[in-house]
Amino acid sequence: MKNSRDNWSSKIGVILAVAGSAVGLGNFLRFPVQAATNGGGAFIIPYLIAFLLLGIPLSWMEWTFGRYAGMHGHGTAPGAFYQIFKRPWAKYLGSLGLLPPLFISFYYIFVQSWILAFTYYSITGKLMEVVKADKITEFFNDYIMLNTKIGPVPAAIIFFLITFACNTALLSFGVRKGIERVNKVAMPILLIMGIILVIRVLTIPNIGQGLAYMWNPNFSELTNPQVWLAAAGQVFFTMSLGMGIILCYASYLKPKEDIVLSSLTAGATNGFAEIILGGTIVIPIAIIMMAGSNIEEIAKLGTFGLGFQAMPHVFGQLPLGNIMQTLWFGMLFFAGLTSAVSIIQPLISFCEDDLAFSRPKAISTISIVTFIGSVISILGLAAGAVDELDFWGGSFLLVVLGTIQAFIFSFVLAKQKSETHPEENKAFAMLNDGAALKLPRFFRPIILYVCPIYLLVLLVSWMATNGLDVLLLTSVKPDEMVTFLGFECSKIAFTWSLRIFLVLVTILLNVAIAFAWKNGKANKGRKTTIKQVELGNS
């Protein structure tokens, strides 16, 4: 079977796409809170160590897996793992590479729609009115709980449907004409908006005090294991590692594309957005403008409280506050847009490459699945559905898949001889293929041994500290009640019911994988032709 796949039209296109998948709410909201509550400037030390020993190596691994998968006509982990092991069970192990984006898609589009709504409210001046009336908390809660109406319909539902339609429309154009083009436009706009906000923040009187709160090192925190775990977790989260996204995007590379430099460039872009933009905008200005508040109080607001309540309040106190609010939510919207399409693309790629669906059929199928999951998130928001989905899709499974990938790269792919470079193993031959600057040999032990061990220690440490409590729900009070669809039930019962739903989704996914291989649509012998596209047509 000869299969023609889409591809990136330029190197800058794939770099911006991968960077766009990583740059999101985690950069502008999660990172500042993590840094401020884990030693301030001292947090950067374990963060950079984790970036060098964990983030960059695992990113190179995922780019390599993606290149290998694309050579055999696959764009996701089931196909990649199957080609590496040549064993039937490997494709089911690869389902772990589809579960994170699937689970995240169940809630991410809804959250993305909040940003679109608040961008609209900023432009119209409604948000400034709410801030001046000191009712931002009530306004936000009413909105997400579907109490804010446009006519008879909750505003949150309307903006969700608009956002869902926009994402679907962009994805319908494919990798080159859809994802690549939107990232070429959105990423520069996002960075420009971020730089404008940074410049404005740095001109605020006494901002040095806010920066001191953020960056004044508390080196005593470096002896706390939780700080190192938090730093590693932040690197994992912010670089989109273990999500199957980088693997999928790398599968659309042209032959001889430089993945060593491309990976570093994408990682550096994400780091700039996180450390320079995220670390400068949020906490420093919040400390200055929210008189009497300290880091701990601000951090307790959480990601959503900080982004949708604290920051509108803070910007509302500045001259031209509505413009600042619009820039803030506009920046977050472009970050959310580039992340959203990257989350859904691996699912579409699986349908196209392994189930042999057409692009429209693949998008329709995934849209139905994600819409059903989104409805559960919307209706179960107050009951904790989003938190539960984020734990599995945005935290736990990322580390599990990342650890598995690291061991496969180091102890399976790196043990296989390259057909094209007999003196080299398959892992590093593919990683260095087409690279202008080859990976230094002294860095190989870090990739082969330090990174897998680092990940294993991270996973075991988490299990030893609070992992079992989270998995078994022992920290949830038996008498804690939540409401879902108008019915009151215990939080434990709701959470286990949601987990049963996720297990059923996992089973159905593996049934789809079995169907793909049984019907010969994902067989190992097929050849792939990558469409060559001139740069001028991008």
What does each model-identified segment do?
Residues 6, 35-65, 155, 398, ...:
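Extracellular loop-to-transmembrane helix junctions
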Residues 1-29, 58-63, 67-95, 254-258, ...:
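Membrane-interface "cap" regions at the ends of multi-pass membrane proteins
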